[in-house]
């Protein structure tokens, strides 16, 4: 780990971390990322695995999606996370890509950031001067941008052990694709993907539910305070429609769980 931190400090913005490569390599192919130096952190043992810390489940940032998907511990204590991981790409991607890479990429259309936001996850970043914890609500700051500094490594993700009713809904044009829109429900929290530059909480939906609105009424507010784009996958208006539909479906599914 220290060698990785030293390399980041030496090369700064010219360097990129490489673990699974699921997010970085496609960007490099399209020249959207052109690092001069790649720092391979896939072999750092302390960045992989699932452990407990107090009332949290701790997942190392270099843990493969497939490990999160199939881990008996994750399935028992955080089924939303295990299920979301099962929808990331195809089996090849899940066996190579990492949870930390998906999060650090900062793509609002990715699956895991949306569910982690709904769970109020905590992200631990390490630099040469120590570690700091970043709340999910503060971690995603812009289009493909996170709160990580160029000299920091995301080392783990902490999710609460408290069991909540949950759901993850995802609409795609093609199977195993990025989400056109996604919705995660965890307890009283609702998060949306691909409805803004970053994953966002559907605060108006949450407030309506707390005030006694029924699910159908609350879900109509899902697209409030969002800024979906129009692209080859969907128009902004269709994304707004999807947000309302997926949120209602997710709330109903979560309510039906024991």
Residue ranges and their predicted role:
Residues 1-258:
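C-terminal structural segment of proteins
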């Amino acid at each position: 780990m220290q060698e990785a931190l030293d390399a980041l400090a030496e090369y700064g913005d010219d360097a990129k971390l490489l673990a699974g490569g699921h997010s970085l390599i496609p960007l490099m192919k399209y020249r959207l990322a052109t690092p001069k130096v790649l720092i391979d952190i896939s072999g750092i043992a302390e960045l992989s695995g699932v452990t407990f810390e107090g009332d949290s489940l701790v997942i190392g940032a270099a843990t493969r999606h497939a490990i999160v998907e199939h881990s008996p511990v994750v399935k028992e204590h955080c089924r939303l996370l295990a299920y979301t991981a099962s929808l990331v790409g195809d089996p090849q991607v899940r066996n190579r890509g990492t949870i930390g890479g998906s999060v650090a990429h900062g793509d609002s259309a990715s699956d895991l950031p949306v569910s982690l936001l709904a769970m109020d996850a905590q992200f631990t970043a390490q630099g040469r001067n120590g570690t700091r914890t970043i709340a999910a609500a503060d971690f995603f700051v812009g289009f493909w941008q996170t709160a990580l500094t160029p000299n920091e490594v995301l080392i783990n993700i902490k999710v609460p052990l408290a069991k909540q009713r949950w759901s993850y809904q995802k609409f795609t044009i093609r199977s195993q694709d990025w989400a056109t829109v996604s919705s995660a429900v965890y307890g009283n929290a609702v998060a949306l993907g691909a409805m803004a530059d970053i994953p966002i909480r559907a605060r108006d939906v949450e407030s309506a539910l707390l005030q006694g609105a029924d699910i159908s009424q609350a879900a109509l507010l899902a697209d409030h305070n969002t800024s979906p784009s129009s692209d080859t996958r969907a128009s902004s208006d269709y994304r707004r429609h999807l947000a309302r539909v997926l949120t209602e479906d997710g709330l109903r599914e979560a309510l039906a769980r024991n």
